[in-house]
Amino acid sequence: MKKIVINGNRPLKGEVTISGAKNSVVALIPAAILADSPVTLDGVPDIQDVHSLIEILEIMGAKITFENNTLIIDPTEVVSVPMPKGKINSLRASYYFMGSLLGRFGEGVVGLPGGCYLGPRPIDLHIKGFEALGAHVTNEHGAMYLRTDEAGLQGTRIFMDMVSIGATINVMLAAVKAKGKTIIENAAREPEIIDIATLLNNMGAKVRGAGTDVIRIEGVEELHGCRHSIIPDRIEAGTYLAMAAAMGEGIKVRNVIYEHLESFIAKLQEMGVKMTIEEDMIEVHPSHDLKMTTVKTYPYPGFATDLQQPLTPLLLKAQGTGEIIDTIYAQRNKHIPELVRMGADASVEGNMIILNGPNQLHGAEVVASDLRAGACLVTAGLMAEGTTTIYNVEYILRGYDHIIEKLTALGADIQMLETEEQEGPFEVDQ
């Protein structure tokens, strides 16, 4: 077990470069097994989720090379084997193997996914999509068994009962080699969907409409390898923009796509954060006398649920009373008791978070309950007077590439240490 120790209230200055998108790469890697020759992914973040997926691929027989953020996957000798439950339990995005195994083999066994606990995240939509394509899906002893009959997967029209990025991607992976045409209606529109579609099309798939709410797929018989560059991580970018606004004395955030962050940047500007926006760089200038605002999360292009927690510490620096309402994951509020421990005037009322500011945070021992809560606590630690110790940092390492090194380069006093036996709070009530 590791912990992060931050000596806070120190100004940050310099440049930080954003890594490839975690929410893309966790689907791009399973998608690679659909090809009949090697797939090269550039800009792959060096995060724990990537290493877990690599281990799963190697168990399946893939040959892997991962150096300097370039991942080469040779799926030529991949076989359909039951997914190792330990890796699946620690990785929610492993459910993308359901779609890619169905697409390649017409069958698969995948343990029920884990990852961050954010309340119920049912995979009913995924199963409904697979069944519409002609698959038979059963839950046996905590694993999903996926099968097809001799006719294989058949293209069809699928209406998503609710907007789901995971279900949209999974159905895309299964449908690209199905017979005939598949139409996904009420599809998710996230940039990561476009990234997945770009990879699939480079492999020889015929996917149209990604980025809109109707995706059309014409099935093909085979897919080949290709080279693909992953889009920048808009959630990591938003996290560093919030840190820069909170503690920066001039920070340039490089390798960003402004259009992917419009709703987030609009909130920063509403608060009074001063920025210069260029083609692939955003510079955050020292900003004072921030104004409180209300945040309500929605599917893309609305305000991303993954960014409400990283923004919370900055909101606590602003004057006034504000609210955060997460319409995607109503239980995404486990960071609030930890911020209160640091002196925040914040509370949870139903599905709403109430914030009163400004607050001067103070160092404390806190625990990360999930990936984005961990990022929130890192930002809070940077803002706080005194020393903050964050436990359960394995969550943070799942999704932030070299966060210690990046923050150290900006002038933060931050380090990651091994925890002593019996040290620190390691669990959060869920």
From Swiss-Prot:
Record pathway: Cell wall biogenesis; peptidoglycan biosynthesis
Binding, UDP-N-acetyl-alpha-D-glucosamine: R92, R121, P122, I123, D124, L125, D306, I328
Reaction equation(s) it catalyzes: phosphoenolpyruvate + UDP-N-acetyl-alpha-D-glucosamine = UDP-N-acetyl-3-O-(1-carboxyvinyl)-alpha-D-glucosamine + phosphate
Location of 2-(S-cysteinyl)pyruvic acid O-phosphothioketal modifications: C116
PANTHER family: UDP-N-ACETYLGLUCOSAMINE 1-CARBOXYVINYLTRANSFERASE, UDP-N-ACETYLGLUCOSAMINE 1-CARBOXYVINYLTRANSFERASE 2
Family (UniProt): Belongs to the EPSP synthase family. MurA subfamily.
Cited Pfam families: EPSP_synthase
SUPFAM superfamilies for the chain: EPT/RTPC-like (SSF55205)
Catalytic center residues: C116 (proton donor)
Domain of life assignment: Bacteria
GO terms of biological process kind: cell division; cell wall organization; peptidoglycan biosynthetic process; regulation of cell shape; UDP-N-acetylgalactosamine biosynthetic process
Listed GO CC annotations: cytoplasm
Catalytic class of the enzyme: transferase
Function summary: Cell wall formation. Adds enolpyruvyl to UDP-N-acetylglucosamine.
Organism: Enterococcus faecalis (strain ATCC 700802 / V583)
Keywords attached to this entry: Cell cycle, Cell division, Cell shape, Cell wall biogenesis/degradation, Cytoplasm, Peptidoglycan synthesis, Pyruvate, Transferase
GO terms, molecular function: UDP-N-acetylglucosamine 1-carboxyvinyltransferase activity
Name of the gene encoding the protein in the UniProt record: murA1
Compartments (UniProt record): Cytoplasm
Protein name stated in the entry: UDP-N-acetylglucosamine 1-carboxyvinyltransferase 1
Major localization class: cytoplasm
CDD domains: UdpNAET (cd01555)
